């Protein structure tokens, strides 16, 4: 067991804050319409250029263990904001740094950290309520395009394409992003389906940066029962390995030995595979699996019809152009199903909707209908170079997530204005003691920082602009950093999704509270010895690299 380095009190917190400063300084330059790019060295290939806060944060690992602990805590605020709302990562980073730094100063001055935390929590909850009160629902294509434009750092084309994609498949529809083979940026609607089941093991992930499993041109095996032993599947698995194509297994469940064997073979490269649970429950699960079978031109392997896994041939497997699996969802794009069969299935579901008297059944049938007939909108992002395409694709993905958040919870005035004006009612909050009051004041000051940073990235004095805006009673009055003018932010179309602003603040406060209430830090002591790398083991011979 490695020896440990133990630090206590203000020394531990100060070193953690040094790590937080290093990460925050790298991330904050990306904030706002005039934020700068960050160039990140890759382990192979050309460097990555990005203006996405969470991408910058994820790339940072510090040599000093204690400073790194602080940096990793701050990174978790950005990552959580990205997971929940898809955007607001830089705002979360700026807020968390401000809250943690001011909180630590007060702890060092003798304030009670637990009361400071209570005061901060009271203030954050009050600001969240203010954000909810001031949010405005969006409906029009123009408003959707505005959110997409702002979230992609002012790229109008991205905003317009996202609005067009939502018009094609609906606001709740499935929209994916992929790289184009040319210079253009297009929206294409293809046959596809999304269901709410993710991968059964993170070891199936092929893209570790986004934590998704991406299968190109896969076979799809649909099995009605649980899979706990792969012995009956050996003939079909060997046929798939020979074809050199990936395999997606959709079953009631894949467990125990079967799951372990698939994972081992996936890691050793013998079999490109992923497994997910079938969507739905009971009879509805079977119906949805039949929908997938029709969409992908496969067969549902069901013992009711006397079918057995050992007798299944590759002809019984469905196929699709691409499958993307995240922790929570599976998207099947461009299944190779027969158009006539899909249309017949759609008509069958429509007639079931007309006949049913249960509101619940009707709702579930309509969900199936939407999945089968709605299709998937694909945003195809092109560019002159690989670096440009990847950078733009990142911005499109961020903008799409932010637009979905805006549709869900509405929008508020952007540019840091909502957080700034939400700080004003906090002075009226009633607390039990001066330490809790100090916690509220920490939040009031921190809420100015995102706007200050946006203004400073545009080359102006942030403190002067903040002072000028606080003199105004209009909560939508703000500073347009793009045109360097004071405007009504809502009328000017400078808006942020309420969910993004809310999540950024809550995640930042959570991380800052952890830091100011930390008294002892334990990390591994740095070691000069380098461990020998483990040799890679191959699969067993005679099975095409598979190991069963």
From Swiss-Prot:
What UniProt keywords are attached to this protein's entry?
ATP-binding, Chaperone, Cytoplasm, Isomerase, Nucleotide-binding
Biological process terms from the Gene Ontology for this record are:
protein refolding
Compositional bias of kind Gly residues:
538-548
Catalytic activity, reaction form: ATP + H2O + a folded polypeptide = ADP + phosphate + an unfolded polypeptide
> Which positions form S-S bridges?
none
Where is this gene product found?
A: Cytoplasm
Q: Name one GO cellular component term.
A: cytoplasm
GO terms of molecular function: ATP binding; ATP-dependent protein folding chaperone; isomerase activity; unfolded protein binding
Q: What is its main location?
A: cytoplasm
InterPro entries referenced in this protein's UniProt entry, alphabetically: Chaperonin_Cpn60_CS, Cpn60/GroEL, Cpn60/GroEL/TCP-1, GroEL-like_apical_dom_sf, GROEL-like_equatorial_sf, TCP-1-like_intermed_sf
Q: Where is this region: Disordered?
A: 527-548
Q: What is its EC number?
A: 5.6.1.7
**Which residues participate in ATP binding?**
30-33, 51, 87-91, 415, 496
Described by its record, this protein's role is as follows: Together with its co-chaperonin GroES, plays an essential role in assisting protein folding. The GroEL-GroES system forms a nano-cage that allows encapsulation of the non-native substrate proteins and provides a physical environment optimized to promote and accelerate protein folding.
Assembly state and interactors?
Answer: Forms a cylinder of 14 subunits composed of two heptameric rings stacked back-to-back. Interacts with the co-chaperonin GroES.
Q: Which family does it belong to?
A: Belongs to the chaperonin (HSP60) family.
Write the protein's name. Chaperonin GroEL
